[in-house]
Structure formats: C-alpha cells, structure tokens
Design a protein with these regions (language model features):
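Mid-chain, well-packed structural core segment of small domains
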Residues: 80-106
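Phosphate-binding P-loop
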Residues: 33-39
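Short phosphate-coordinating micro-motif centered on Lys-Gly-acidic
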Residues: 2, 6, 14, 62, ...
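Short beta-strand-centered segment that lines the nucleotide-binding/catalytic pocket of NTP-utilizing
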Residues: 66-81
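P-loop (Walker A) phosphate-binding loop of NTP-binding proteins
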Residues: 46-48
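Conserved lysine of the Walker
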Residues: 53
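Short hydrophobic/aromatic beta-strand immediately N-terminal to the Walker A/P-loop
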Residues: 42-44
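N-terminal pre-Walker A segment at the start of P-loop NTPase domains
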Residues: 8-30
C-alpha cells in the first residue's frame, strides 16, 4: 500500500496487526533483523498513550543492543543505548525545547534515533523518517502502519 506525505511524495507503507505487547516487540525486532533500519535513520513513532510505542522500541533496541534494558524516557527525555537514541517528546512544546536538550546535535551522528510523540515536533523537523503509527484496537491488539519516506 502507498500513501502520500505532506509534500505530495508517494511513500511505501505496509499495515500489520499484533495480538500482544510481546508480538509488537517481536514485530519491531524482526523489522530490524530484515534491515529496515540502519545507522542515521530517524524512526518517528506515533500513537496514543498506551498504544505500544515503548514496546516497539524494546524490540528494535533488542536487535541493536541486546543487553540493554529499555524504559520510556518520559522524564529523562532521552535514553541512550548502543547505536540507538530514544527520545520522548511528550513534554516538548517548542523548537527552543529541542535545542535545550541537544536534539539537533544528535541528528548528525550515526545513531538510529527513535522519537516517541513525533507529532509534537513535526513542525520543527524536515528530515525523512521511517514512520511507525500504532493504533490500539483493543486491550491487546494493535494495528501498526510502517511507512518509509526515505526513498
């Protein structure tokens, strides 16, 4: 399936369904294993509170840094793992906030950057991303849209 981004560019997208938090984590791990992410990529996670953004991140980080313990960076704003930075933008309200946490400095490095609550910073950001939209169907099931705008 293809969708159009805001600038009218057609991007590749796929829809997946998971039936548990563990399946969401495994799904992300398998995407990484299938080379869907590489150094320098920006992964834009979108979804409501409790949708599974951190579970997705756990799977992705488990592939790149298997010994890491992944937690949500809600209060720290960023957690760093081997070759992966995990930002939580829930409390970010302005471009000045992004500057104060050194966010833009990290874009020039070769880490994979995972951004929870990407919609909060989309207006300050024009990089191409791998977009992951996670929607809660019920308590356990999730609909995940993988959209790649890098090409």
């Amino acid at each position: 399936m293809n969708i159009t981004n805001l600038s009218g560019k057609i991007i590749m997208s796929e829809i997946f369904f998971t039936k548990s938090e563990r399946e969401t984590e495994e799904f992300a791990f398998n995407l990484a294993k299938d080379n869907k992410f590489k150094s320098g990529d920006i992964v834009a996670l979108r979804g409501d509170l409790g949708a599974g953004k951190t579970a997705f991140t756990r799977g992705l980080v488990r592939f790149f840094a298997p010994d890491s313990r992944v937690t949500s960076p809600t209060f720290s704003l960023v957690n760093q793992y081997k070759n992966v930075l995990h930002f939580d933008m829930y409390r970010i309200n302005s471009e000045d906030d992004l500057l104060s946490i050194g966010f833009f400095d990290e874009l020039d490095k070769n880490n994979i950057i995972i951004i929870e609550w990407f919609d909060k910073i989309a207006d300050f950001f024009d990089e191409e991303t791998v977009r992951i939209d996670i929607a809660k169907i019920n308590e356990n099931e999730r609909k995940i849209i993988y959209a790649d705008t890098r090409y």
